Amino acid sequence: MISNGTGSSFCLDSPPCRITVSVVLTVLILITIAGNVVVCLAVGLNRRLRSLTNCFIVSLAITDLLLGLLVLPFSAFYQLSCRWSFGKVFCNIYTSLDVMLCTASILNLFMISLDRYCAVTDPLRYPVLITPVRVAVSLVLIWVISITLSFLSIHLGWNSRNETSSFNHTIPKCKVQVNLVYGLVDGLVTFYLPLLVMCITYYRIFKIARDQAKRIHHMGSWKAATIGEHKATVTLAAVMGAFIICWFPYFTVFVYRGLKGDDAINEAFEAVVLWLGYANSALNPILYATLNRDFRTAYQQLFRCRPASHNAQETSLRSNSSQLARNQSREPMRQEEKPLKLQVWSGTEVTAPRGATDR
């Protein structure tokens, strides 16, 4: 999440530097918007993706899309112009939107980790644990927390040291004030506590994936075990690595500002860590959708402008012609133990022996 509504602006005096930064920020904004639009379209056009699990992914995509449309363009303009040109009223609205949307984005990531944890650790009770009502309540809770830490806190001045406005009249800057209490509460609720829980849940998920791979290895399928464990490791490392790299520097700076004061951090460094946090919204469509096999298929259908039903029928027709021959050739092997696939994380499957999961 982000507690800073805008971030400090530092002037880019060198034209080459200004051009480079402009290109980088523009590309980041376009990727954020396009990537999350594709996620929303994929779910809207593909019935197979309309599941409770993907409710959180869609919520994440909508949140990041709104961030890309309502916040990032103004952040980029402010960063490049070195002054806030939209007045005091819009400054408070802008900073509140920034805090709210970044908070909601991180809390959606947090809920995705809990959802996957329940699916992997207790798959039989998953339909009982994750119900439509509980998903709806979770989504409402995400936005209640986000609004409380953004619009409510900023407009009531709970975040300020001695003033209620984020706007500086002397120097036209728009920056959220951070006092000690707001910095600590916001940092803990929206980053450090979710980070701790996510580390625990993903470690448990990885451990289960590794145990399943070991069972396969003991049955002689060492190659499948190695591939499965490698996929689980890479996927979980990518998910947690991106989250920590993008947000940990920002929240460290944010809490430090609450402890030492708003001017305790170099403006250039503060701007870098702020945009590093924004970059997480561009990575989310890749990490939480592209790594999922069903999403990859939906992307292919979307870019080919072909409906999912057409692809399914075509695949079915192609496969039916050779199904009888394959069934006859596989008949002697059906007595052997068949593997099951456990989706450890979106797009990552580890094969496990049926006996290991039927117990």
Swiss-Prot record:
Sites annotated Essential for histamine binding: D98
Compositional bias (Basic and acidic residues): 328-340
GO biological process: chemical synaptic transmission; G protein-coupled receptor signaling pathway, coupled to cyclic nucleotide second messenger; gastric acid secretion; positive regulation of vasoconstriction
Start-end of Polar residues biased regions: 310-327
Known tissue expression: Gastric fundus and, to a lesser extent, in brain.
Alphabetically ordered keywords of this record: Cell membrane, Disulfide bond, G-protein coupled receptor, Glycoprotein, Lipoprotein, Membrane, Palmitate, Receptor, Transducer, Transmembrane, Transmembrane helix
Membrane topology: Multi-pass membrane protein
InterPro entries in UniProt: GPCR_Rhodpsn, GPCR_Rhodpsn_7TM, Histamine_H2_rcpt
Annotated disulfide bonds: C91-C174
Region listing for Disordered, in residue ranges: 310-359
Ranges of the Cytoplasmic topological domain: 45-57, 115-134, 205-234, 290-359
GO molecular function: histamine receptor activity; neurotransmitter receptor activity
Consequence recorded when altering D186 to A/N: Abolishes tiotidine, but not cimetidine binding
Site (Essential for tiotidine binding and H2 selectivity): D186
Residues with attached carbohydrate: N4
PROSITE patterns (alphabetical): G_PROTEIN_RECEP_F1_1, G_PROTEIN_RECEP_F1_2
Function: The H2 subclass of histamine receptors mediates gastric acid secretion. The activity of this receptor is mediated by G proteins which activate adenylyl cyclase.
The protein, known as: Histamine H2 receptor
Organism listed in the record: Canis lupus familiaris
